[in-house]
């Protein structure tokens, strides 16, 4: 019979996704067929499965930790916010509709049967399912229609482990308050607590742990230290963390504009892992002063973020930096913004809007979303810092609702292989100072990344690095380091016991 365990949190960004990945890795190391599952994910970081389905990046990297191919069943509902009040609803990997929060809350009960069927189909194929909740189960205003926290635990009939973040302060209040707000039958599902992101001497916590166990009757299964491991973050709130501020000195500094609706910032994890690269996410014009490359990333609301660029002064700063000879790159929504014109008669109804004008392109938004994994080849001749990447193979994925047409003065950046056909993608200027593409995940291609970083090094008079960094091996090492740390600091045997003892008939 399939065993399962669910991680829920006292709040968002407490580390549920990373710890779930760690459990997936541990069970994989122990020889168990393991799959992650999150019934509903709200995130702008998404990826594409091999069959063209869109799902949350967190479940993709958890599947990688488990040594399996990502499957859209691991995240049947994906919500992608388009504004403060609206979100695009993606069901089983395909866009269903756009809804506001109230409409979606009313709609959720209709999803329960489909979510349960998807979960049960996974459970038939795997020995262990590691479930992840969202935010906190103590959102009492959402309890009656919950499908992602205790509502999902009830559907899966699985035990729950509560994750609490001590780094933000008030960890014992968060644990006690969360459990106090649960109904008795919900509290009974909580079989343990993990205190996460601790810095210092754990002995200082012992008296508090004893008291919280006495007050709640729930054992603390371990205290995880703040780990120096390089793993993907899912929530945009994580961009406030130190690792995204680029404080460590490196030869090359790459500035990524932190758009209000930034999506797929995981595009830059492989770039940030390069030993000679410093990544900085910026929101202020003055932060562009030392950049060797500026990147406009993906966006879930291109025209809104383009307006923010202008209102914040970032657009002028990017253009000034470009005039000073610093290359500017755009990915997906960022690529669209670099162009001359954007025509939107689909999403915002704003009609024709001017872009930044660094690429002579016209983008027209469309109703249908393109979601596909692709192989591509960089163009045979590329200028300036891109020259060494000419002709290199790359892999990535597309997630966009629009088509960009090149005008005079732009050259195709790469050729995609799609459905047996060659399709042009991207644009680059003759001087190489403006470059755009729809291809997410481009920097996961090791040879390409090293080629362009060496191109940036050459512009500064620095010698190239001859060694190519393997990002896939790096990720595998990080998963193993995470699993090792969890085995050291968490009672994994107790988690096995919890799963074995909590067997409810489905």
From Swiss-Prot:
Molecular function, one GO term: catalytic activity
Protein name: Cobyric acid synthase
Active site: residue positions: 332 (nucleophile), 440
Gene this protein is translated from: cobQ
Presence of the UniProt keyword Magnesium in the record: no
Function: Catalyzes amidations at positions B, D, E, and G on adenosylcobyrinic A,C-diamide. NH(2) groups are provided by glutamine, and one molecule of ATP is hydrogenolyzed for each amidation.
Family under the similarity heading: Belongs to the CobB/CobQ family. CobQ subfamily.
Signal peptide annotation: none
UniProt keyword Iron-sulfur, yes or no: no
Pathway note: Cofactor biosynthesis; adenosylcobalamin biosynthesis
Species of the source: Salmonella choleraesuis (strain SC-B67)
NCBIfam families, sorted: cobQ, PRK00784.1
Pfam name, any one: CbiA
Source organism, top-level taxon: Bacteria
Annotated GO biological process: cobalamin biosynthetic process
Keyword vocabulary terms for this entry: Cobalamin biosynthesis, Glutamine amidotransferase
InterPro entries: Class_I_gatase-like, CobQ/CobB/MinD/ParA_Nub-bd_dom, CobQ_GATase1, CobQ_N, CobQ_synth, GATase_3, P-loop_NTPase
Residues annotated as domain GATase cobBQ-type: 251-448
């Amino acid at each position: 019979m399939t065993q399962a365990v669910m991680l829920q949190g006292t709040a968002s960004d407490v580390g549920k996704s990373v710890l779930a990945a760690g459990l997936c890795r541990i069970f994989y190391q122990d020889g168990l067929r393991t799959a992650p599952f999150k019934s509903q994910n709200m995130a702008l970081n998404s990826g594409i499965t091999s069959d063209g389905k869109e799902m949350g990046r967190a479940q993709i990297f958890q599947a990688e930790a488990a040594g399996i191919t990502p499957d859209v069943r691991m995240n049947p509902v994906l919500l992608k916010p388009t504004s403060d009040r609206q979100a695009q609803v993606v069901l089983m990997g395909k866009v269903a509709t756009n809804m506001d929060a109230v409409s979606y809350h009313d709609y959720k009960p209709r999803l329960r049967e489909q979510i349960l069927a998807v979960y049960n189909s996974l459970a038939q194929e795997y020995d262990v399912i590691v479930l992840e909740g969202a935010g906190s189960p103590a959102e009492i205003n959402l309890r009656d229609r919950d499908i992602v926290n205790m509502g999902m635990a009830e559907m899966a009939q699985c035990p729950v482990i509560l994750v609490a973040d001590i780094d933000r302060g008030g960890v014992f209040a968060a644990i006690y308050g969360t459990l106090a707000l649960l109904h008795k039958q919900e509290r009974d599902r909580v079989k343990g607590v993990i205190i996460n992101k601790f810095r210092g001497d754990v002995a200082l916590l012992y008296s508090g742990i004893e008291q919280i166990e006495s007050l709640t009757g729930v054992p603390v299964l371990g205290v995880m230290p703040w780990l120096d491991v390089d793993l993907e973050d899912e929530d945009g709130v994580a961009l406030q963390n130190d690792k995204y501020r680029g404080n460590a000195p490196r030869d090359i500094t790459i500035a990524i504009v932190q758009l209000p609706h930034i999506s797929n910032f995981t595009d830059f994890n492989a770039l940030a892992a390069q030993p000679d690269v410093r990544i900085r996410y910026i929101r202020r014009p003055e932060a562009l002063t030392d950049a060797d490359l500026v990147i406009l990333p993906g966006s879930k609301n291109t025209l809104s973020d383009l307006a923010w660029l202008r209102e914040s002064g970032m657009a002028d700063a990017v253009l000034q930096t470009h005039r000073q000879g610093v290359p500017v790159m755009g990915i997906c929504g960022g690529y669209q913004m670099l162009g001359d014109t954007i025509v939107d008669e689909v999403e915002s109804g704003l009609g024709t809007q001017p872009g930044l004008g660094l690429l002579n392109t016209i983008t027209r938004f469309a109703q249908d979303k393109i979601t596909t994994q692709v192989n591509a080849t960089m163009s045979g001749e590329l200028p300036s810092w891109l020259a060494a990447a000419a002709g290199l193979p790359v892999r990535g994925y597309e997630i966009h609702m629009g088509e960009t047409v090149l005008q005079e003065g732009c050259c195709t950046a790469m050729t995609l292989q799609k459905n047996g056909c060659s399709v042009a993608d991207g644009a680059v200027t003759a001087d190489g100072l403006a470059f755009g593409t729809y291809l997410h995940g481009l920097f996961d291609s090791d040879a390409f990344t090293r080629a362009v970083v060496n191109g940036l090094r050459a512009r500064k008079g620095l010698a190239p690095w001859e060694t190519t960094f393997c990002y896939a091996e790096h990720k595998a090492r990080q998963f193993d380091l995470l699993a090792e740390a969890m085995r050291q600091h968490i009672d994994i045997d107790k988690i096995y016991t919890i799963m074995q003892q909590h067997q409810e008939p489905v």
